[in-house]
Amino acid sequence: MNDFRDSLSSEERSHLVSMQGKVKQTFLRHLQRPEWSAISLVAEWNSTMDSINVGMQTEGVKLACRAGCSHCCHASVEIFSPEAFAIVRTLKTLPADRLSAIRQRLLEYGLDNIDDPAWTKRPACPFLDDHRCSIYAVRPVACRQAHSLDVKACENDAPHIPQ
């Protein structure tokens, strides 16, 4: 697997390590709060991850990822329970026709892939709508951290997305 960090300069790598340290500090600080909750932790984690992404781009890292590019949305993604709760909360705000379409895609997704434990079919995420994430604001951490420097490397049907 091609790791995007291999293509970073030493200065960019140093910045990334610094940002990872900030994520860890944020996480630990959050756990010490009396009002701690898993859902608020996920929201803060997402915000921190987004800040890291912006910081990387500010530092000159050129990500190939763009709206409408959904190559990484054809991979198995595990989510944490609080992420699922945030997704459900978002889905409840959608118009009935969009929610019905997502429900149908979720059903088909489960039925089509029940016999594919090795995940060789690489089905589209049921939350994709015209190659765009319909839950982008609450997408799971696994999706937030998927980045590529080369869209061509993502276009194959490999079981892993190059990062």
Label for each model-derived stretch:
Residues M1-Q163:
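Hydrophobic scaffolds flanking metal-cofactor catalytic centers in soluble metalloenzymes
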